[in-house]
């Protein structure tokens, strides 16, 4: 087992159970991509077992802080099973949910979402890439499902020195799926949609917005950066008379319109604008248009620190 020795004073974050080891924290040592290494303090004290990534500024990601823990296939299988069992404790009003959330579940760089009878996984670190086959088999074993689609096409893969990969990892099936959540349904495309296909993390926000619309009797709603219309449908389900939805993606808007129709709403209750949000808002101001509620969830403007200044200007625009 190869050992990575940290610089003096760089052990504190690991001692607080932060799972990342940056390039600048390492005094000496190296390994192949995804290889399990021992992380020691400058004084030689064991800190963690981690997956090494020679191409990334996050040079290693911790698997375990227990010196007695073996990082092997059994460890991977147990971690996957534990994550999925944890979700079974919650009464989630949807057939779509996140089963594994990377570092939070002890599987750094792994994202797994479930859409009905289909799993979608993103492998975004060298460590989980190395254990991909074991992870795939463990996922099917733990869920009893047979279909697993890989969406390892995130830009973060390049930071790990990994190529983009997209396609069926286990089984075959349709990439156009139906997501059921709360009282509505939504079309989801797991091959070309954002993230693994949809923003499952906003499920409860959509329900809350629906409840607000009903309780506060929203008439006119504006949904900016609407993507495939999740909040548009939520507003209509809450009784909104009309929703204006703006996005710069034609395919996303087409799916948003399909989602409105899927839930039984007349097309005249929704307007879809293929346009720039900031420019549209300026036009609305000039026209004196107003809305009872506005959903404003812009995309990521600052992927790195280098983009921070430009992002700050964009948020104020």
Please name every model-derived segment.
Residues 1-116:
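Non-catalytic accessory regions of SAM-dependent methyltransferases
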Residues 45, 56, 127-129, 194:
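Short, surface-exposed beta-strand-loop junctions and turns on beta-sheet-rich folds
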Residues 47, 158, 304:
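Glycine/Thr-rich phosphate-binding loops of Rossmann-like dinucleotide-binding domains
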Residues 74-78, 82-86, 90-93, 144-161, ...:
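A short, charged
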Residues 100-113, 129-199, 207:
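Non-catalytic substrate-recognition/targeting regions of SAM-dependent transferases
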Residues 118-123:
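Carbohydrate-binding surface patches
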Residues 173-317:
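Rossmann-like S-adenosyl-L-methionine
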